[in-house]
A protein has these predicted regions:
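Solvent-exposed loop and capping/linker segments of extracellular ligand-binding repeat ectodomains
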Residues: 33-458
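Viral virion structural and adsorption modules
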Residues: 1-37
């Protein structure tokens, strides 16, 4: 074999490797040409696991007829990795599959989806569905550039890719980027995939805003979550990620020690089979970081430790709301609070019999608002050592705690009209003891000391 390069005829050419093409002069050992091809099993593929025919549907939403260039994506597909057919993603493209057949996909434009949440006319994104059961695998980045699987991830590039795909059962062999991600890149990717039982590995250690937001939301057959090794988080990176995964029994480790805005917001909300929570070692918090994280996790019995001593606005807000089997709660060591920091934290935890100590003496607006609302098994309040109250700091704090019969407070004044204790002891036990260890004067009602209770002064 011989070729001509730069007017020079070179003989004795040898192709060294089927995956890495090298043209080598065997006499000099000089590499004349080299091109890395993707390993064959790393093309993104869809495999028909149904015992019969199946049809792939690629539904593309184009916000405006004027979207062109890198957003007007063409894609190639093949059933043998030799013969490739080019399709333009517009409307719905359909590809038939026989039983057991795989269809491979590739692209070399470096761009796939684009979605503009503030102007949907400037949007272009494709959703993949099939008419029967199937699995997906290979390197997802071959949908961006099959010649370079380390291609830079672009914002929204795989947004809603399998959204509401009712027949996707397995994504375990799907390969994701190990490098840094981009804003919204995997948002809602598997959202609503009700048959999905296995998820792909997510090896990235540095995240981007909203990158995994709602990624597996509503995957009701998913029993285990992928490992999440990231230590550098970003705002809303895991927000709603496993929300409504009602078969999920265990959660992945979350090793990050520095949190970001909304990073774990609603992450496991509605995971009704989750029996244990991951350790939460973070000591640097951010506003809303844990908000709604385990809401409606009705099988959760023990809360993780929360070691942070410096907290942030709404950081624990609604964190365990309606965890109806929760009996063990964490120590809350912070002594200086922020607005809404514990707002509704244990609301409707109906099995909770013992509340955590609340050592804080410097309060903030709404800090304990509705914290134990509806905790019907709670009999004794934690000691409330703060002498100076702030706006609605205790509002509805114990409302609906029908077994509560013992409260201790050091407050010195509740008369400023800022509703410090608004309805805080509404619908509690008919009789009880109120330990007034401060100098405050309380009215006899649900916003003070309940009628039928005994006040014991210091």
């Amino acid at each position: 074999m011989s070729i001509v390069i730069d007017d020079k005829k070179i003989t004795n050419i040898n192709i060294l490797n089927k995956n890495v093409q090298k043209i080598v002069d065997e006499l000099t050992g000089k590499i004349i040409f080299e091109k890395t091809k993707p390993v064959s099993n790393e093309y993104f593929y869809i495999e028909n696991t149904y015992n019969g025919s199946n049809t792939i549907s690629l539904k593309t939403t184009i916000g405006s007829e004027n979207i062109t260039g890198s957003h007007a994506t063409q894609l190639q597909y093949s059933k043998d990795k030799e013969t490739w057919t080019t399709i333009t993603l517009s409307g719905t493209n359909k590809i038939p599959m026989n039983s057991g057949e795989r269809v491979y996909f590739r692209n070399d434009s470096g761009s796939f989806n684009w979605y503009n949440s503030s102007n949907q006319e400037d949007s272009f994104y494709t959703q993949i569905n099939c008419s029967n059961n199937h699995k997906v695998g290979g390197n997802i980045n071959s949908l961006l550039d099959y010649n370079n699987h380390n291609v830079a991830i672009t914002p929204y590039c795989f947004y809603q890719l399998f959204y509401n795909n009712k027949y996707l059962t397995d994504a375990n062999e799907l390969i994701f980027s190990k490098t840094s991600l981009a804003d919204y890149c995997y948002e809602s990717m598997f959202n609503g995939c009700i048959k999905l039982t296995t998820a792909p590995a997510l090896p990235a250690t540095t995240l981007a805003p909203y990158c995994y937001q709602y990624m597996f939301n509503g995957c009701t057959a998913l029993t285990s979550a992928p490992e999440l090794p990231a230590t550098t988080l970003s705002s809303s990176c895991y927000s709603g990620m496993f929300g409504g995964c009602t078969s999920l029994t265990t959660a992945p480790e979350l090793p990050a020690t520095n949190l970001e805005l909304y990073c774990y917001y609603g992450m496991f909300g509605g995971c009704t089979s989750l029996t244990s929570a991951p350790e939460l070692p973070a000591t640097t918090l951010a506003p809303n970081c844990y908000r709604l994280m385990f809401r409606n996790c009705t099988s959760l019995t023990t809360a993780p430790s929360l070691p942070a001593t410096t907290i942030a606005e709404n950081c624990y807000g609604e964190m365990f709301w309606n965890c109806s089997k929760l009996t063990v709660v964490p120590t809350l060591p912070a002594t200086t609070l922020e607005r809404y920091c514990y707002h509704r934290m244990f609301r409707e935890c109906t099995s909770l019999t013992t509340a955590p100590s609340l050592p804080a003496t410097t309060l903030a607006e709404y800090c304990y608002g509705e914290m134990f609302y509806g905790c019907t098994s709670l009999t004794t309040s934690p000691v409330l050592p703060a002498t100076i109250l702030v706006q609605e700091c205790y509002q509805n704090m114990f409302n609906g705690c029908t077994s509560l019969n013992n409260v201790t407070s050091y407050a010195n004044d509740i008369s400023s009209g800022k509703e410090y204790t608004f309805m805080w002891l509404n619908n509690v036990a008919a009789t009880g003891t109120f330990h007034n260890l401060g100098s405050a004067t309380y009215p006899i009602n649900a916003s003070g000391i309940p009628s039928g209770w005994t006040e014991v002064k210091n």
